[in-house]
C-alpha cells in the first residue's frame, strides 16, 4: 500500500529498501528508480560481486530488467538444518546418556517430564509453537520432525517425478504429523502447546521448566540467552541427529520466490546513486572481511548479539556459505592452527568473545551465546557436512499461499497433532486444499517453472 501511494505521488526517498520483487517491478515500470548497472560494476568491490555470484545467476537476475540492474538484493545465507537443543545438565542430573538418535533424544525428553527435571512438578515436554513450522527466522517450530520424515512443508518443491508440488500436501508431511501426534499422546510434546504464545514459552525457559526445543544455530542468541541470563548453570547443548535422513531432505529441490525479498533501490535523479554500492561494500566487505581497526566497533556489536536491524539499511550481503567459513576460521584460531592476524574483522571480534568466554573472563549471556552458536551449533552442522540444495528461481508468478489456504493448513496440522482429528483427516485436508484454489495455484507454479527452463 505504501508503494502504491509513493508511485501515485511519485515521491520516494533517495534510497529505499523495497519488499517484494513485484513492488520492485512496479517502481521500474513507473520509471522512478535508477539503473544501477554501471554503479554495480564500477563502485562495488570484487568481494561483494563474489558474494552475489555464490548464489548463482538468479539472485541478481531477479533485480534485472532488459539487461539493467535496478537494485541490490538482500542475500540469505545457508542457515543449515534445525538442531535439537537439550538441557545437558538435566541429562546428567537424571543419569542419562547423551542421545545419538532421534528416538533416544525423545526418550530423554520423556524422562525430563516423567522424572520432573525442573523439580517442582511443572516440567513440560518439547516446546512447540502453534505455527508448527518456524522456518529460518522464527522460534519454537517442530520443523525437524518434518525433515526427519523427508518432508518440506510450506515450500514449493519438485517431487521425484520432477513435478511441482506444495510440500505441505505430501505423504511425507502426513507421516511427520502422525509422529507428532504420537509424541503428543505420549506426553513428550508439550501438553499445553495449543495454549502457548511465544512469550509464554520464553518464560518457561527462563524459569527452568522447559529443557527441549528445536532451533537453528542462532538459538543461543534468541531465545536461549535470556534463559542463560537468569540461570547460567542451565547448560543447553545442540544435537544434530539422524544425519543421513536430514542430508537427504536437505537435497530436495526447493523453489525460491522473490515475493518477500528485500531490494535496495535509488530514486531516479538522485545525484549519488553510487552511495548504495559504497555502503554495501563498506559494511559487508571492508568492515566484515578486512581486519581493519576502524571497523572494529561495528563488528564488536555483532559479536555481542546487538540487533543487526540497527544498520542504516536492513539487508545483509554475504557468501552463501558464510556461516561455515566464519566458524571454520574462528575454530582454527582457537585451536591455534590459524594465526589470529589472518582473521577478518568480524571473525576477530567473535574470536575474542569466544576466547574470553572459554577463559572465564566473559561470563555474560552474550559471551555464552557467541560461543554456543558460532562454535558449538555451527560446529555440529560442519561435522555433518550437510548443505542445502541450491534453490530454484520462481519468477513471473505469484506463488504465495493465500491466507485462506494457510489457515486451512495450520488448522489441519494442529487438529491432527492434538488428536482432535484422526491422522487420515490429512487426506481430507489435501482434497480441500486443492479444491479451494490449490489446484490452480499448483498449475500456475508448474507453468512458471516450465517456462523458466526454456
Where are the language model's segments positioned?
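A structural signal for short loop-to-beta-strand junctions that line the ligand-binding cleft
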Residues: 6, 47-86, 154-155, 162-169, ...
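Extracytoplasmic/periplasmic substrate-binding proteins
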Residues: 131-139, 144-154, 181-342
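Conserved small-residue motifs centered on glycine
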Residues: 278, 285-411, 420
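Helix-loop-helix "hinge/cap" segment bordering the ligand-binding cleft or interdomain interface
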Residues: 37-42, 64-138, 158-216, 263-299, ...
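A ubiquitous short alpha-helical element
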Residues: 72-74, 163-166, 391-400, 415
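Extracytoplasmic "Venus flytrap"/periplasmic binding protein-like
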Residues: 2-58, 64, 89-100, 114-118, ...
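Histidine-centered catalytic/metal-binding microenvironments
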Residues: 411-454
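Short, solvent-exposed loop/beta-turn-alpha elements that line the ligand-binding surface or hinge
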Residues: 35-54, 97, 153-171, 244-253, ...
Amino acid at each position: 500500500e505504501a508503494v502504491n501511494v509513493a508511485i501515485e505521488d511519485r515521491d520516494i526517498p533517495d534510497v529505499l529498501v523495497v519488499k517484494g520483487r513485484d513492488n520492485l517491478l512496479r517502481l521500474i515500470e513507473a520509471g522512478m528508480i535508477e539503473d544501477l548497472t554501471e554503479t554495480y560494476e564500477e563502485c562495488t568491490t570484487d568481494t561483494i560481486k563474489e558474494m552475489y555470484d555464490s548464489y548463482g545467476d538468479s539472485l541478481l537476475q531477479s533485480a534485472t530488467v532488459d539487461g539493467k540492474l535496478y537494485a541490490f538484493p538482500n542475500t540469505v545465507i545457508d542457515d543449515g538444518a534445525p538442531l535439537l537443543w537439550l538441557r545437558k545438565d538435566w541429562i546428567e542430573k537424571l543419569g542419562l546418556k547423551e542421545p545419538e538418535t532421534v528416538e533416544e533424544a525423545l526418550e530423554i525428553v520423556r524422562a525430563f517430564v516423567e522424572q520432573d527435571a525442573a523439580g517442582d512438578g511443572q516440567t513440560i515436554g518439547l516446546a512447540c509453537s502453534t505455527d508448527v513450522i518456524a522456518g529460518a527466522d522464527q522460534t519454537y517450530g517442530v520443523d525437524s520432525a518434518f525433515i526427519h520424515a523427508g518432508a518440506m512443508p510450506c515450500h514449493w518443491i519438485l517431487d521425484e517425478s520432477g513435478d511441482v508440488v506444495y510440500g505441505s500436501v505430501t505423504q511425507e508431511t502426513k507421516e511427520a504429523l502422525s509422529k507428532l501426534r504420537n509424541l503428543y499422546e505420549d506426553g513428550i510434546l508439550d501438553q499445553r502447546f495449543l495454549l502457548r504464545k511465544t512469550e509464554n514459552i520464553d518464560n518457561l525457559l527462563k524459569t527452568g521448566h522447559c529443557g527441549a526445543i528445536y532451533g537453528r544455530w542462532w538459538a543461543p542468541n534468541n531465545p536461549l540467552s535470556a534463559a542463560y541470563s537468569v540461570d547460567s548453570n542451565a547448560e543447553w547443548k545442540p544435537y544434530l541427529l539422524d544425519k543421513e535422513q536430514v542430508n537427504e531432505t536437505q537435497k530436495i529441490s526447493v523453489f525460491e520466490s522473490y515475493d518477500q525479498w528485500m531490494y535496495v533501490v535509488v530514486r531516479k535523479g538522485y545525484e549519488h546513486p553510487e552511495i548504495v554500492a559504497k555502503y554495501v561494500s563498506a559494511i559487508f566487505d571492508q568492515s566484515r572481511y578486512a581486519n581493519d581497526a576502524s571497523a572494529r566497533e561495528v563488528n564488536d556489536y555483532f559479536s555481542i548479539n546487538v540487533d543487526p536491524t540497527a544498520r542504516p539499511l536492513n539487508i545483509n550481503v554475504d557468501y552463501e556459505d558464510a556461516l561455515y567459513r566464519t566458524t571454520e576460521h574462528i575454530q582454527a584460531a582457537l585451536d591455534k592452527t590459524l594465526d589470529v592476524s589472518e582473521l577478518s574483522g568480524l571473525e576477530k571480534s567473535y574470536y575474542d568473545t569466544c576466547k574470553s568466554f572459554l577463559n572465564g573472563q566473559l561470563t555474560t549471556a552474550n559471551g555464552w551465546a557467541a560461543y554456543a552458536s558460532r562454535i558449538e551449533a555451527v560446529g555440529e552442522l560442519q561435522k555433518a557436512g550437510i548443505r542445502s540444495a541450491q534453490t530454484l528461481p520462481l519468477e513471473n508468478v505469484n506463488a504465495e499461499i493465500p491466507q485462506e489456504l494457510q489457515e486451512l493448513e495450520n488448522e489441519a496440522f494442529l487438529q491432527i497433532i492434538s488428536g482432535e482429528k484422526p491422522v487420515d483427516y490429512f487426506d481430507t485436508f489435501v482434497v480441500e486444499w486443492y479444491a479451494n484454489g490449490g489446484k490452480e495455484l499448483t498449475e500456475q507454479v508448474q507453468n512458471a517453472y516450465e517456462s523458466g527452463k526454456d
